[in-house]
Each structure stands twice: as C-alpha cells, then as structure tokens.
C-alpha cells in the first residue's frame, strides 16, 4: 500500500524560491514573513547554514546575499512597509525573492511596482497553483561595476 505524504506549505514554496534565488548553501540568507521560522528550519534541514529570520538577524549592514520573503495572506501595501527596512539588510548585489498568494494580473503589477520603488529590478518569476514568486536584484550592482 502506498501512503500519501502531505507536503507542508513551507516545503511547497521553498523549492521554487531557491530556484529563483540560485543561492549556494554558503550564502547568507534572511527570511521574512509570518512563517519565517518554519522556512529557516527547512533551509537548515536542506544544508543552508547561514540563515536568519528578521527576528534574530541583528542590525542592517548589507550583510545578507538573499532575502526570501513568504508573503502569503498579506497585502502588497504591507510588503512595501517591510521592504522599507529589509533592503538595508541586503548586500549591494543582493537578491529578494517574494512568494505571494495566487492573484490577479493587477496584483502582480502592484508587486512589481513595490519592488521597483525600493530600488530593485525584477528579474524572473514563477507561477504555481498555490501562489507565485518573483525575484528582484538590487540596482546597486550597476554602480559597483561602474566604480570598478
């Protein structure tokens, strides 16, 4: 007899988020959102050892390479407030991946505008039956390459 295994919501979203982030197991990752602790433990279980949640990450100093944001059952307006301070934790070459509930195209446009308003350039996205994710990188990368 084959037993069906229920996959927790955190596991369903972690694979597409990691695929968009393209992060190694050594990169520093900050996790935000209502289920950030659950995602942090799942990342630890998968071998990502340098992961923190927004509740235990210290002061913002551009120390994280990737921010994974679980924004299910929350508004884009509330995301804008979180992005106000979250981007300060990212390195100049940092990347943000935001997971949201399934929404209408207008909601996706609002998400894109919110990311762009915080100095992020949308790079890629994925749509699944239980939500979608968008990755965006900091625009500071271009200024670094000009200096070099």
Predicted feature residues:
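Beta-strand-connecting loops/turns
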Residues: 26, 62, 93-94
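A short SAM/SAH-binding and catalytic strip from SAM-dependent methyltransferases
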Residues: 64-80
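A short glycine-rich, Lys/Arg-flanked "PGG" loop and its adjoining helix->strand segment in the class I
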Residues: 78-95
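Conserved class I S-adenosyl-L-methionine
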Residues: 24-36
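A short, well-structured beta->alpha microelement
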Residues: 12, 17, 35, 40-62
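Class I S-adenosyl-L-methionine
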Residues: 107-148
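Class I SAM-dependent methyltransferase Rossmann-like catalytic core
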Residues: 1-26
